[in-house]
Design a protein with these regions (language model features):
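Conserved PRPP/pyrophosphate-binding segment of the phosphoribosyltransferase/PRPP-pathway fold
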Residues: 1-100, 107-137
Length: 137
């Protein structure tokens, strides 16, 4: 699975050449989920994006502070409530242009909540990058 992450990360990197950014952030996993999975798929995708943009990657700046139920296990309408207040930012991002990377966007609840947290900490702009987008059922 990591090889696929590297492949898709390189494909994302090819698409971002025109983006101006100060920082690349992968959507964080809760530490418990990271331990059980063994890797953060968003981080693996974000590495080549950071390299292509020639800007830093910071996987520790934004943290998942609540171990939420897996979004994929929930009905669409329950996902926003499940992810609410699940993220925390550890430093001020005033004026920073952020690229937030994840693997799949379904309802967008996780990315939206993380972006909300980044904006509350001063991010000037946030570009969301995902490998895949699922369509409503």
């Amino acid at each position: 699975r990591l090889a696929l992450g590297h492949y898709f990360g390189r494909q994302l990197a090819r698409l971002v050449q025109t983006i101006s950014a100060d920082l690349v952030i992968p959507l964080p996993l809760h530490p418990d989920r990271l331990r059980s999975r063994g890797f953060n798929q968003a981080l693996e995708l974000a590495r080549p994006v950071s390299k292509a943009l020639a800007c830093p990657l910071d996987a520790s700046l934004c943290q998942r502070i609540r171990n939420t139920q897996a979004q994929a296990d929930l009905p669409w309408k329950a996902r926003r409530q499940n992810i609410r207040h699940a993220f925390h930012c550890v430093k001020d991002l005033s004026g920073q242009r952020i690229v937030l990377v994840d693997d799949v966007m379904t309802t967008g609840a996780s990315l939206d909540e993380c972006a909300r947290t980044l904006r509350l900490h001063g991010a000037a702009s946030i570009v969301l990058l995902v490998v895949a987008r699922t369509l409503p059922e």
